[in-house]
């Protein structure tokens, strides 16, 4: 089974989880980034406001063709209790995604808020099927038990 992991990471937490999943499945990693350069303060002020409004930003790569994959995994930090504008743009720019099964995870330092329902909405708007979703608090990022739970969630989704 071919798995593609598309993720956005600012502090490295989401990247760490994505890499852990990729190593367990020999999956392809695609890190999406914002093309606009922000300083630390403006990045969170501007992008958190955009996240709250469920807006998208301009990203690199602008689109990802997932037609050759059997499962796609999305990863995002939580900003303003929702996934980031970067991952929103990535989902919106997908090619070959109709009817693909998807798994989503988020990393956060507080609470996930409306992240799950927002991820679900965006994924289903693109014609994909969300088969699993989870959230990981930043204090659990290095926790082997928690990362194994995420890998097990993806493994169970592979069997769907």
Language model region names:
Residues 10-14, 80, 111-112, 139-143:
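Alpha-helix N-cap/loop-to-helix initiation residues
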């Amino acid at each position: 089974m071919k798995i593609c992991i598309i993720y956005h990471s600012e502090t490295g937490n989401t990247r760490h989880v994505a890499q852990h999943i990729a190593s367990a499945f020999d999956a392809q990693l695609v890190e999406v980034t914002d093309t606009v350069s922000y300083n630390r303060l403006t990045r969170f002020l501007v992008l958190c406001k955009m996240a709250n409004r469920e807006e998208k930003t301009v990203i690199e790569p602008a689109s990802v063709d997932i037609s050759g994959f059997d499962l796609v995994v999305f990863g995002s930090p939580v900003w303003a209790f929702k996934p980031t504008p970067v991952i929103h743009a990535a989902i919106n720019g997908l090619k070959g995604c109709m009817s693909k099964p998807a798994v989503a995870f988020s990393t956060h330092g507080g609470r996930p808020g409306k992240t799950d329902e927002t991820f679900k909405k965006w994924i289903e708007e693109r014609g994909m099927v969300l088969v699993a979703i989870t959230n990981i608090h930043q204090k659990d990022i290095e926790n082997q038990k928690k990362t194994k739970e995420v890998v097990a969630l993806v493994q169970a989704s592979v069997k769907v």
